[in-house]
């Protein structure tokens, strides 16, 4: 039923309806959190008070030793002022020619 109402109202009406419902859910969420904090269920009976053991934490994984001498990407440190130009020249032979429209380009 709600979906058919939203479809009839259009975008603005649907947005307005969603905002109103969001306010209702916010109010409901605060009520639920208060009832959960009180320690009683909805019927007024105390909740099951059995002691639960805290969740066990997994054993910490030992960290791997950090070793800079085994770095494999050596070209990463091989930059110079002309690195980009060298690569540009190297890759230019693989570039495809740009298509032409058939007319001359404008002179600037």
UniProtKB/Swiss-Prot annotation:
Hydrolase is among the record's keywords: no
Transit peptide: 1-34
Keywords, sorted A to Z: Electron transport, Membrane, Mitochondrion, Mitochondrion inner membrane, Phosphoprotein, Respiratory chain, Transit peptide, Transport
Residues with PTM Phosphoserine: 105
One Gene Ontology cellular component: respiratory chain complex I
Signal peptide: none
UniProt subcellular location: Mitochondrion inner membrane
Transmembrane region(s): none
Function: Accessory subunit of the mitochondrial membrane respiratory chain NADH dehydrogenase (Complex I), that is believed not to be involved in catalysis. Complex I functions in the transfer of electrons from NADH to the respiratory chain. The immediate electron acceptor for the enzyme is believed to be ubiquinone. May be the terminally assembled subunit of Complex I.
Subunit relationships: Complex I is composed of 45 different subunits. This is a component of the flavoprotein-sulfur (FP) fragment of the enzyme.
Family membership noted in the UniProt record: Belongs to the complex I NDUFV3 subunit family.
Protein name: NADH dehydrogenase [ubiquinone] flavoprotein 3, mitochondrial
Organism: Gorilla gorilla gorilla (Western lowland gorilla)
Organism lineage: Eukaryota, Metazoa, Chordata, Craniata, Vertebrata
